[in-house]
Amino acid sequence: MYEGAVQELIDELGRLPGVGPKSAQRLAFHILEADPEDMKRLVTAITTVKERVKFCTVCFNVTEQETCNICRDQRRDPSVICVVEESKDVLAVERTRSFRGRYHVLGGAINPIAGIGPEQLRIRELLTRLNDGAIQEIIIATDPNLEGEATATYLARMLKSIGITVTRLASGLPVGGDLEYADEVTLGRAFEGRRNALL
């Protein structure tokens, strides 16, 4: 264990998702050895993103404006909404270039162990978006893991009574995997082969 500021930096870096103790230590020493100007730019970038970035008032994707560029894009199909867990999943889907509709970011997935139920997700906001009648299809693109499947099943059952088409991405995505790590071809094929969400 190191002392003072070095250990504090390692501890803070270790709190980041996917960063274990060894990675935190490597990052801390990289920061210590890096050019001070590079580190000033990094600190500025982190501060700027925390000050400027917020959630789109329509879909809850990240943006620096009131609505994100996807919601503002008139070339996108407003009748189809792809429901994802997190903003990073929007980027994963966009990389496929297979989807030209709009999005809705739930802000997570149902996970009773972590105390996350439907009330903690942006499901109410999704239902509000459906009120105008313009939406004809909801594509559920939650992660193919236990929490993602629970969320997809909950949404499909809830939306069934509304009378819109509800589909789920096709297989090809590994069970237990994360959408953001799927390659573009696999994710693109999953969109093409999507199926009815309630079988």
UniProtKB/Swiss-Prot annotation:
UniProt KW DNA damage keyword: yes
PROSITE patterns in alphabetical order: RECR (PS01300), TOPRIM (PS50880)
Gene that encodes the chain: recR
One Pfam assignment: RecR_C
Cited function: May play a role in DNA repair. It seems to be involved in an RecBC-independent recombinational process of DNA repair. It may act with RecF and RecO.
Residue ranges of domain Toprim in the record: 79-174
Superkingdom of this protein's organism: Bacteria
PANTHER family: RECOMBINATION PROTEIN RECR
GO biological process, alphabetically ordered: DNA recombination; DNA repair
Cysteines paired by S-S bonds: none
Protein name: Recombination protein RecR
GO molecular function: DNA binding; zinc ion binding
Source organism: Paenarthrobacter aurescens (strain TC1)
